[in-house]
């Protein structure tokens, strides 16, 4: 079983009761490492101060963790690239969720197959009128 470590950020507000329900069902944890204390926007509203070193924050929804992760990767200097998202069950079991194979989805990973790509430039796309009555779907052409 994975043991999560880190200090919670300094936050003077509340989560609006969202974590009380999450304690009965499931909650999500995001961990990251920061080189310095910095102010960041909480996905639940308000601002908090992240600690220098390891940080651990519990949130009620995975989308909130993903939003905070995007903020960590884009708004800070140096960029914080090492965040991880976990699902925490009421039993204490921890499941690692994101990034699933260790590389963020928009990055190229050795062995990751490209999905829905066409090996042509946009100017080489067929004319829509030639596809319309051909019996083929646009994604098949």
Swiss-Prot record:
GO terms for biological process: photosynthesis. PsaD can form complexes with ferredoxin and ferredoxin-oxidoreductase in photosystem I (PS I) reaction center. It comes from the Bacteria. It comes from Synechocystis sp. (strain ATCC 27184 / PCC 6803 / Kazusa). Disulfide bonds: none annotated. This is Photosystem I reaction center subunit II. GO terms for cellular component: photosystem I; photosystem I reaction center; plasma membrane. Keywords: Photosynthesis, Photosystem I. InterPro entries: PsaD (IPR003685), PsaD_sf (IPR036579). PS I from Synechocystis PCC 6803 contains seven different polypeptides. The polypeptide corresponding to subunit II from higher plants is missing. Belongs to the PsaD family. Pfam families: PsaD (PF02531).
């Amino acid at each position: 079983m994975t043991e999560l470590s880190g200090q919670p950020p300094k936050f003077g507000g509340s989560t609006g009761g969202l974590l009380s329900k999450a304690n009965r069902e499931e909650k999500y944890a995001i961990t990251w490492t920061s080189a310095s204390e910095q102010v960041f926007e909480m996905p639940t509203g308000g601002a908090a101060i992240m600690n220098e070193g390891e940080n651990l924050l519990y949130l009620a929804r995975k989308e909130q963790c993903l939003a905070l992760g995007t903020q960590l990767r884009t708004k800070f200097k140096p960029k914080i690239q090492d965040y991880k998202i976990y699902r925490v069950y009421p039993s204490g079991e921890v499941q690692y969720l994101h990034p699933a194979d260790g590389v963020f989805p928009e990055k190229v990973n050795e062995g990751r197959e490209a999905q829905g790509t066409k090996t042509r430039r946009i100017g080489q796309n067929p004319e829509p009128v030639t596809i319309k009555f051909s019996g083929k779907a646009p994604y098949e052409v």
